[in-house]
Amino acid sequence: NIKKTTIYIKPDIKDYTVVSFDKGKEIIVKGEEATFAVYEQLKALTSETQRYQKPKMKVSSDSVFVTDIKVNELKNFTSAYVKGKLRFKPVTIITYDKLQSGINTINGTQNFNAINYALEPDGYGETLVLNLKENETKTLLKLGLHYDGLYKSAVLANISQKNLFFKNDNASLDLIIGDNLRYNLDYYVDNGFNISFGFKSTFAQFNRNVANSIQPGGIVGGDISLINIDFKDWTNQAYFQSVFVQKFLIGAGLEYKHLQIVPITIAKNSPDIDNSNYFSVFGYLKYDAFDNKYFPTKGWTFTGDIHSYLMSSNQTKTFNPFTILKADFAVAFKVIPKLVFKFQTDAGVSIGEKSVPFFDFVLGGYGFAPVNNFKPFYGYDFLSIGGDSYIKTAGTLDYEFYKKNHFNFSANFANIGDKIFSSLDWFSLPKYSGYAVGYGLETILGPIEVKYSWSPEDSKGFAWFSIGYVF
């Protein structure tokens, strides 16, 4: 009873909750301030002859044993969906940081208006009790802008619909209007740690001048150094995936792709470079712990992918079944406050008989949405160098000199060509290198980036602009 209390100390902690673990120092300061306010009253209670001896502090654990996870009944989502967003299962020891990260992930889905949770002792550990209030909004419309040197200017209209057919599902359509009409259609049923499934359909196109020598023997015959092409890619995937060891996304699926590459600068009635259908199976393993996709300050990512092309309508009469393996790893960390170093390495190889070159790895350019095996590379223009195998390493120093304003310096090195892993040549000094200095600004419309890039192998430099989220 407060009225019967001789000295009542009440810190001002109304801005904190029972899970404000990252605000511990601030909460302690609030307690000290409230205590010093009644210091004289406390001093009057002490004895000069028998001073209080503070016992040794017992450090409590920064982790908790979660024995069970209980979720209130939901109309449009299952408990498996919610537990999957937490990224940990019952009967698991987790840190409070991981608990907070899981709650933040649930909040980030924007599927719930209110999230109340508590840890309740159950004799063996703690039961995590979640009480969620669903967001009644199911249809969302979003708009976006983007510009890069490959797809040029684009306006995005995205419409998404939750619970279109089932609980936990989400359908999303990106209609991209601009210099190159494109779309992305995605339907996904998210069952958390259980097997989830989905369908993707994408259409991408662009027009570009490409060096005829980008592949051995040239893209077309004759004494032609540069070709203007229309590139069109229509890809459809059906896949399933799950969460592996509570961290990695692991999945597999089937793919149908139609690829059309038309030469514009050749004779009017010249045949298409390719106009074929391709059927393949694929598998992947993914992990992403970056705190920011475009300007990460901590975390790491990994992607491993295997793609086996089994059949084709074979318009070029040169198709043979083949498999592409590729992997990408990146890590970011702070060197000093405001200065971040990001290291990235990726590699790929084609296995099997000599086949069509249209799925070779192609390096060059920056800031574009990936399609097939086109990869960014500082120092070279878009789609400049290619081969059926490659290895690349890159490093970036990023300095945030003012809030959301970044200055960065990047360097990348690569070996690329046909069958480079059949000998130790890939382990030699890099054949290709490039550097870039840039400025980046984080805005509500996405990042705005300006980069100037050059290579010691070429006297020509490139200025690249990327505006808005990449799509």
Where are these regions (language model features)?
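Conserved catalytic block of serine-dependent lipid acyl chemistry
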Residues: N1-K14, E26, G31
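A short, acidic, flexible beta-alpha connecting loop/helix-capping segment that sits on the rim
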Residues: I13-Y16, K23-G24, S453-D458
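Periplasmic polypeptide-binding modules associated with outer-membrane biogenesis and secretion
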Residues: G24-H146, N158-S160, S172-N191, T323-A327, ...
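C-terminal soluble interaction/assembly domains
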Residues: K89-I93, L424-L429, G440
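Gram-negative/organellar outer-membrane beta-barrel architecture
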Residues: G102, G108, N116-F290, Y294, ...
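C-terminal outer-membrane beta-barrel translocator/porin domains of Gram-negative envelope proteins
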Residues: L145, V281-K286, F290-Y402
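Short glycine-rich beta-strand segments
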Residues: T202-F206, E255-L259, G304-S313, G348-G352, ...
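Outer-membrane beta-barrel transmembrane domain signature
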Residues: P271, F279, F333-V340, V356, ...
